[in-house]
């Protein structure tokens, strides 16, 4: 992606998400998507059906050996537990949105404008090249 690639779009966004390779704290996430237990199971089943070569991925994490989807499901469950610790379980029990009330996991997203993303990429690239 280069700055000129999106000149005809008003405000393109780039989404980064917490996954098996990249970890970030809830304070970095500016979008949190609740997932039901059914959502988490469906994601895992879909992955196992569609990405057959990744069923036995050899290195999804230094602390886990198994399918990416099982590790991702656990991460999303852990993120829900972390939010419950930070906000209290009552936050979820009394929440107006049934998706939040019934959540078993959360996907953490860090959304930013494309220019901001490219600023960060350029800063990181400069840092890496100078070290």
Where are these regions (language model features)?
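Metal-dependent de-N-acetylase/amidase catalytic core
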Residues: 1-131
């Amino acid at each position: 992606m280069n700055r000129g690639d999106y000149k005809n779009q008003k405000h393109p966004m780039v989404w980064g998400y917490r996954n098996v390779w990249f970890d970030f704290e809830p304070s970095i996430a500016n979008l949190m998507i609740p997932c039901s237990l059914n959502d988490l199971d469906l994601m895992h089943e879909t992955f196992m059906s569609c990405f057959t070569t990744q069923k036995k991925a050899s290195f999804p994490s230094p602390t886990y050996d198994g399918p990416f989807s099982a590790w991702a499901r656990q991460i999303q469950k852990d993120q829900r537990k972390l939010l419950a610790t930070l906000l209290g379980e009552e936050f979820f029990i009394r929440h107006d949105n049934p998706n939040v009330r019934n959540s078993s996991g959360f996907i953490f997203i860090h959304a930013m404008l494309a220019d901001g993303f490219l600023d960060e990429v350029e800063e990181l690239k400069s840092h890496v090249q100078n070290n």
